[in-house]
């Protein structure tokens, strides 16, 4: 039984682990996926979380309220970043 489970791990036949997430590190079903998304302990891919900060999410005044940032300013910020 253990050999069988090992042979189907990460394949379409595996009903517990998500084969999409196992192969490419992303799942087309997202949070709605019924299978497990096991994150590897090591990877050749570097993940840089929160690298780009959208000015619409971060622009605040001194009193803590959000500033309005135009779509043109957001696009310029994005273009300059990338």
From Swiss-Prot:
* Intracellular or extracellular location(s): Nucleus; Nucleus speckle
- The answer to whether UniProt assigns keyword Protease to this entry is no
Please give the family membership noted in the entry.
Belongs to the splicing factor SR family.
The encoding gene is: U2AF1
Zinc finger motifs (C3H1-type), residue ranges: 12-40
Q: In which organism is this protein found? A: Sus scrofa (Pig)
Role of this protein: Plays a critical role in both constitutive and enhancer-dependent splicing by mediating protein-protein interactions and protein-RNA interactions required for accurate 3'-splice site selection. Recruits U2 snRNP to the branch point. Directly mediates interactions between U2AF2 and proteins bound to the enhancers and thus may function as a bridge between U2AF2 and the enhancer complex to recruit it to the adjacent intron.
User: Record keywords: Coiled coil included?
Assistant: no
Please name the GO terms of the biological process aspect recorded for this protein, alphabetically. Answer: mRNA splicing, via spliceosome
For this UniProt record, the keywords arranged alphabetically read as follows: Acetylation, Metal-binding, Methylation, mRNA processing, mRNA splicing, Nucleus, Repeat, RNA-binding, Spliceosome, Zinc, Zinc-finger
The record's note on quaternary structure and interaction partners says:
Identified in the spliceosome C complex. Heterodimer with U2AF2. Interacts (via RS domain) with PHF5A (via N-terminus). Interacts with ZRANB2. Interacts with SDE2. Interacts with SF3B1.
Q: Which GO terms describe its cellular component?
A: nuclear speck; spliceosomal complex; U2AF complex
Which stretches are transmembrane?
none
How is this protein named in the record?
Splicing factor U2AF 35 kDa subunit
The RRM domain covers 65-82
List, alphabetically, the InterPro entries matched: U2AF_small, Znf_CCCH, Znf_CCCH_sf
Pfam families linked to this entry: zf-CCCH (PF00642)
GO molecular function terms listed in the Swiss-Prot or TrEMBL record: RNA binding; zinc ion binding
Q: Which PANTHER family match?
A: U2 SNRNP AUXILIARY FACTOR, SMALL SUBUNIT (PTHR12620)
Modification N6-methyllysine, positions: 39
| Residue positions, PTM N-acetylalanine | 2
């Amino acid at each position: 039984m253990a050999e069988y489970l090992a042979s189907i791990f990460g394949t379409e036949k595996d009903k517990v682990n998500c084969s999409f997430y196992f192969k490419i590190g992303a799942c087309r079903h997202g949070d709605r996926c019924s299978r497990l998304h096991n994150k590897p302990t090591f990877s050749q891919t570097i993940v840089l979380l929160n690298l780009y900060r959208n000015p619409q999410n971060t622009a605040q005044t001194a009193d803590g309220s959000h500033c309005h940032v135009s779509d043109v300013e957001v696009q310029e910020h994005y273009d300059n970043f990338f």
